[in-house]
């Protein structure tokens, strides 16, 4: 009876809260529709022409899907895609990503995650397209868009760091949803304080329970909007009140997540603990420096030039359009630029053990989108639009390069895996039905042809994961689970590298050592 008490109480409160939740949702839907009708009327009265929001969404989604078509064609199992497809597990709860777990049940039609690719990845690009259109709607305050604006909005979903997210066959929609959850609260920034605080808190809570790497997007967009408000001539009090309400809603969501929902997590690559108070700021700045060092090495020279010019165009456009005096406008733009640059990676730089993988850095893609969206706004000052549009084009092209590289890596992995299996068949231990412990050592690395792409290699090197080797469960699932190896046993409790096993086979691709019921494969 005691075991049923908590679930029954939870069910009771969920049922009791349903009417209130319905009223809240109904209010926000009605408020959003009312604001849209008002904005559409203002757009018509202003004489602004362009692509309507609905058509703009379809265009942006189509461009995004075409952009990732090479990734979809590669049919690549990215990192933990292999074990998820083999075992159907979720396990996002370990990182307190309960919303991802719940949404995955809906997307995959049950608790067991079936491989439904490319549906999740296409859903992710639809969510990113919606996020981009909403960002344009929020910043430009109109319901039509120009071709320039749509071009730069494609950066949001096709920047190299988000490509590392959409590569996941299972995780992609929830990574994209974290961006949408950070954008939606800003639709209600002009509503009453209570409504804005609540939706901001809920939005940040949704970010933290889907993918925490997006935790810096909301405050970054708040800073960009505050700068626009100030440049339009709105009073310091109005701008300050907007920032204060946004900060309060953000803190509300973070505190609730930290105190009520979050569970401590610590893996071999990331944890959610913070350093001591005295070390927090130096640690944050050091990690921030590491993130930007990675960006400098990831981006080839032409990308870096285009990104810097896009940032410069953002600054110039902001100052030229400002109703304030030039020097204060320059100063405020510089402050906003620094703040956004510090916020775009969210809370990750503050973690004692953080992650520097490309998938954790897509906030920088949002920052580039903000730069481009500001520079491309309107029909004037065409030269300022060019850097961001060029950046959107090179990212579009790179998405095909990356997808093709995944395909090449997959073929190389299959080739090397089949060679190992073929040679194992000749080992005497496999001539009976008795189980044999087989371990992998070393790694095949990247496909040799990728080394011939010096301009793209560093970005590709970080985006393309290890696919076959020892020491990491994610690089071994394919070998142990996908080839129906009848009498092969995966036993991580014993380390065959410590045994002096005799060489049974040695060739240019691998060395096979073995004795009795133990076999070690050393990949070269």
Regions found by a protein language model. Name each.
Residues 116-118, 143-149, 192-198, 235, ...:
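Membrane-helix interface segments
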Residues 182-197, 229-234:
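Membrane-interface transmembrane helices that cradle and orient dolichyl/undecaprenyl
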């Amino acid at each position: 009876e005691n075991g049923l008490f908590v679930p029954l109480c939870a069910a009771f409160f969920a049922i009791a809260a349903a009417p209130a939740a319905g009223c809240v949702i109904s209010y926000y839907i009605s408020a959003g529709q009312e604001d849209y009708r008002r904005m559409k009327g203002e757009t018509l009265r202003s004489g602004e022409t362009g692509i309507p929001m609905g058509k703009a969404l379809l265009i942006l989604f189509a461009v995004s899907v075409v952009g990732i078509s090479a990734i979809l064609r590669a049919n690549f199992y990215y990192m933990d895609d292999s074990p998820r497809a083999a075992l159907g597990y979720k396990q996002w709860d370990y990182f307190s990503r309960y919303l991802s777990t719940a949404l995955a049940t809906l997307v995959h039609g049950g608790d067991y995650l079936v491989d439904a690719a490319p549906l999740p990845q296409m859903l992710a690009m639809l969510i990113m397209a919606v996020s981009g259109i909403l960002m344009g709607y929020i910043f430009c305050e109109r319901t039509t868009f120009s071709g320039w604006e749509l071009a730069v909005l494609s950066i949001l979903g096709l920047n190299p760091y988000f490509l590392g997210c959409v590569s996941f066959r299972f995780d992609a929609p929830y990574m994209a949803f974290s961006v949408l959850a950070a954008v939606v609260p800003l639709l209600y920034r002009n509503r009453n304080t209570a409504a804005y605080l609540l939706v901001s808190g809920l939005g940040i809570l949704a970010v933290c329970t889907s993918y925490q790497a997006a935790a810096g997007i909301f405050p970054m967009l708040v800073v960009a909007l505050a700068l626009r408000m100030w440049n339009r001539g709105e009073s310091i009090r109005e701008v300050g009140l907007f920032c204060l309400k946004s900060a309060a809603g953000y803190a509300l969501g973070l505190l609730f997540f930290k105190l009520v929902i979050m569970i401590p997590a610590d893996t071999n690559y990331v944890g959610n603990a913070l350093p001591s108070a005295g070390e927090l700021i130096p640690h944050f700045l050091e990690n921030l420096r590491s993130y930007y060092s990675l960006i400098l090495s990831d981006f080839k020279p032409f990308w870096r030039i285009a990104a810097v010019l896009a940032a410069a165009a953002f600054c110039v456009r902001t100052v030229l359009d400002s109703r304030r005096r030039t020097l204060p406008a320059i100063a405020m733009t510089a402050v906003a630029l620094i703040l956004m640059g510090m916020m775009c990676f969210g809370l990750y730089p503050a973690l004692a053990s953080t992650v520097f993988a490309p998938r954790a850095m897509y906030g920088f893609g949002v920052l580039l989108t903000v730069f481009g969206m500001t520079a491309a706004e309107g029909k004037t000052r065409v030269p300022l639009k060019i850097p961001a549009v060029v950046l959107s084009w090179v990212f579009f092209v790179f998405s095909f390069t990356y997808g093709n590289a995944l395909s090449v890596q997959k073929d190389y992995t299959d080739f090397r895996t089949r060679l190992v299996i073929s040679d194992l068949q000749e080992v005497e231990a496999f001539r009976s039905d008795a189980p044999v412990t087989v371990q992998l050592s070393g790694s095949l690395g990247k496909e040799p042809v990728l080394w011939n792409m010096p301009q793209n290699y560093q970005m590709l090197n970080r985006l393309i994961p290890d696919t076959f080797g020892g020491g990491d469960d994610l690089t071994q699932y394919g070998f142990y689970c996908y080839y129906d190896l009848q009498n092969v046993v995966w036993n991580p409790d014993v380390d065959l590298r410590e045994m002096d096993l005799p060489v049974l086979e040695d060739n240019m691709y691998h060395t096979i050592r073995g004795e009795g019921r133990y076999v070690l494969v050393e990949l070269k």
